[in-house]
Amino acid sequence: MLEEYTRPARYVENSHIVTKPALSDAELIDFENVGTLESFNTDGLRSILFTMAHIPNMKEKTLRYPGHIDLMKGLIKAGFLNTTPISFKGQEISPMEFTSSLLFDQWKLGEREEEFTLMQIRISDAEKTICYDLYDEYDTVTQTSSMSRTTGYTCTAAVNMLIQKLFTAKGVFPPELIGKDETCFHFMLNYLKERNIHYRKTEKPVHP
């Protein structure tokens, strides 16, 4: 988890891979249901850098509450996220592992603690911008966190897709290649919708 704050962030600009420090290019963005969040570069494109190389511009950013960037920069500057071991009372310890151990319990959700998951996907060309917005909350009925719902049900959707032989290609495939198949794409969204996880799609002209 902490590595996303230290690993250089790669994105695509004018069909070239560009690398910048994590936490760079900060923006404040307003979201319905949540309010203002700050976004920053993280190395989240991963396989998409290569599987979607025909797309000239791609960027992934992480969203957190305002103030998060300065907090993490403070930890980095103080050395808490260094991976090089240091000597402490005769023992070699990794600052990164030490910090992770300290924060692990702080990150744990309390029993029935409510949280939410937010994601926005924006796709633009010369004519229009298409947005897919996801907002999901803790399910009080099933007592399931939104992160468990949005990730877990996506995995079980993929398993059901294979069982129903909707995706029959052989080999190892990242999710974006499965999504290129329109049938699989709609199966995934409908599966999530049945479990009250909704991606809201909107379209706007680039030049109204």
Feature annotation, model-predicted:
Residues M1-P208:
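C-terminal catalytic/substrate-binding lobe primarily of soluble NAD(P)-dependent oxidoreductases
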